[in-house]
UniProtKB/Swiss-Prot annotation:
Pfam families: DUF247. The chain crosses the membrane at residues 498-518. It is a single-pass membrane protein. PANTHER family: BNAA09G04570D PROTEIN, BNAC04G53230D PROTEIN. Keywords: Glycoprotein, Membrane, Transmembrane, Transmembrane helix. GO terms for cellular component: membrane. It comes from Arabidopsis thaliana. This is Putative UPF0481 protein At3g02645. It is found in: Membrane.
Length: 529
């Protein structure tokens, strides 16, 4: 038996979608919103940039629960939809006067604002969207009640708790904060009580999930910031990222270039001498002078091993140079998006050997990242790592990339930490000095997590962070241990041809002296005999 044909053809379905789109546009244009409501409407819930989604899709795709319209129709999340409806029935039974139809009617005046918060077009009709908001906001509030500082009963158990936590912190899995406030206000019948409870659960959630240890000091300032937040992920972002304006760094760059030019004159002078030596040794007369005695010596008994070692040293540098050129070409061929700019900053281990000491700051804000050049102390906010941290970090970076037009402060901070953490030894040192608190299985897992964050939507510079990086580099390169090590690396290990030539000349002189002594002693014995 042939399957039944669909009621609407593809053309009719396409025409139906267009009709619904026109209706939504007319409804949006005809809606009467007050002036302050229009100012508050901002796009704040975005799709993850493809560059980031391709690098680690598991961190951006919900696995257990959908919040909002973007992922609610996915079959793998339907099981949790039934659970959300069960929680909704319990909420209805708990509050005698609570009816979801009344909540949907309360949210109806906010439909235009709700749609305006989403960057992607929402294909649901108004009633469907409002019911999604009512059910999801009620579930989310019940789930977050366990983080309240007050003793509030919750209807949700902790089964799959961490999975749900990761899902509700994803950028595509957000609902506007004003919807949560309206739902709580409807339940508690008090705007002030709703704000107090919502602020309480959000601060508790941020303390548990934040990658930086946050301390909330002033309640009044916190309430003022809370009023301006767009959703849960935005609230966490505002708590750990300072608000700064885009700075003009041209003058600072010129000063830094002047300082670098003055400080590197001696090194450039030595490089020029080395370059001239290479030009002399690369000439044909010098090549003949060098190779002729070397061929004689290499054919003597016992010198074959020395010849093989020298040939290896000569050819290895050429092979490394060829490999470096090939790698540079391959890097240029990498397609967009760009890799995160590798910071020119030593690792924690190298800095520790050079005398740098890492100190945790009292507040978890990124603005506390500083370096004291006099004492060699590197101040960093305390980093909190657990099984949820990677997802939170990646979604904060994605949210900043889509929502911020100025400097990407949090992205630059993650690049800084990625630059100083290269191995498990770096993680161990940070942990022992109180800068990092890890609940992962091992230090190696923590290092791999940071090093895995290698994609960025766009490169950026942040004034106070870049100044800190420059101060650290200046302090590190100014240490005598580092200077001597670099000189040995550049002018000893990097000059095998010159060293091999000097060794060959010295060996030739010793062999000649030995032959002369042998011939002269034989001549004396001959005359004496």
């Amino acid at each position: 038996m042939l399957p039944k044909k669909p009621i609407f053809s593809s053309t009719e379905q396409h025409r139906f979608d267009e009709t619904r789109w026109v209706i939504n546009v007319q409804k949006s244009l005809d809606a009467e919103l007050e002036e302050h409501d229009l100012e508050e409407v901002t796009v704040s819930i975005f799709n993850v940039p493809k560059a980031l989604m391709c690098s680690h899709p598991d961190s951006y795709t919900p696995h257990r629960v959908s919040i909002g319209p973007y992922h609610c129709l996915k079959p793998e999340l339907h099981e949790m939809e039934r659970y959300k409806l069960m929680i909704a029935r319990k909420i209805r039974n708990q509050y005698n006067s609570f009816r979801f139809h009344d909540l949907v009617e309360k949210l109806q005046s906010m439909e235009i604002k709700i749609r305006a918060c989403y960057h992607k077009y929402i294909g649901f009709n108004g009633e469907t969207l409002l019911w999604i908001m009512a059910v999801d906001s009620s579930f989310l509030i019940e789930f977050l009640k366990i983080y309240s500082f007050r003793k509030v009963e919750t209807l949700i158990n902790r089964v799959g708790h961490n999975e749900i936590l990761r899902d509700i912190m994803m950028i595509e899995n957000q609902i506007p904060l004003f919807v949560l406030r309206k739902t709580l206000e409807f339940q508690l019948e008090s705007t002030e009580s709703a704000d107090d409870l919502l602020l309480s659960v959000l601060t508790g959630l941020c303390k548990d999930l934040s990658p930086l240890v946050i301390k909330f000091d002033d309640d009044q300032i916190l309430k003022a910031q809370f009023q301006e937040c767009n959703h849960i992920l935005d609230f966490l972002y505002q708590m750990i990222v300072p608000r700064i304006e885009e700075e003009e760094l041209e003058e600072d760059d010129e000063e830094n270039r002047a300082d670098e030019n003055g400080g590197n004159r001696a090194i450039r002078f030595m490089d020029e001498i080395k370059h001239q030596f290479k030009r002399v040794f690369a000439s044909r007369p010098a090549d003949l002078i060098l190779r002729f005695p070397w061929r004689i010596i290499s054919n003597l008994p016992g010198f074959m091993a020395l010849k093989l070692s020298a040939d290896y040293l000569f050819t290895r540098q050429e092979n490394e140079a060829t490999t470096t050129r090939q790698e540079s070409v391959s890097i240029l061929d990498i397609e967009k998006p760009p890799l995160v700019e590798e910071l020119t900053i030593p690792s924690v281990s190298d800095l520790h050997k050079a005398g740098v000491r890492f100190k945790p700051t009292a507040h978890g804000n990124i603005s506390t990242v500083t370096f004291d050049s006099n004492s060699g102390q590197f101040y960093l906010p305390v980093i909190n790592l657990d099984i949820n941290t990677e997802t939170v970090l990646r979604n904060l970076v994605a949210y900043e990339a889509t929502n911020t037009s100025g400097p990407l402060v949090f992205t630059r901070y993650t690049e800084l930490i990625n630059g100083i953490i290269d191995s498990e030894e770096d993680v161990r040192l940070l942990r022992e000095q109180g800068v990092l608190v890890s609940r992962l299985k091992s230090d190696q897992e923590a290092a791999e997590m940071w090093n895995g964050m290698s994609k960025s939507v766009r490169l950026t510079k942040v004034g106070f962070l870049d100044k800190t990086i420059e101060d650290v580099n200046r302090y590190y390169t100014g240490r005598w241990k580092v200077k001597i090590g670099r000189l040995v690396e550049v002018y000893v290990y990097g000059s095998w041809q010159i060293l091999a030539f000097l060794a060959a000349v010295l060996l030739l002189m010793l062999v000649s002296l030995q032959l002369f002594s042998l011939v002269f002693s034989s001549f004396l014995r001959f005359r004496a005999g």
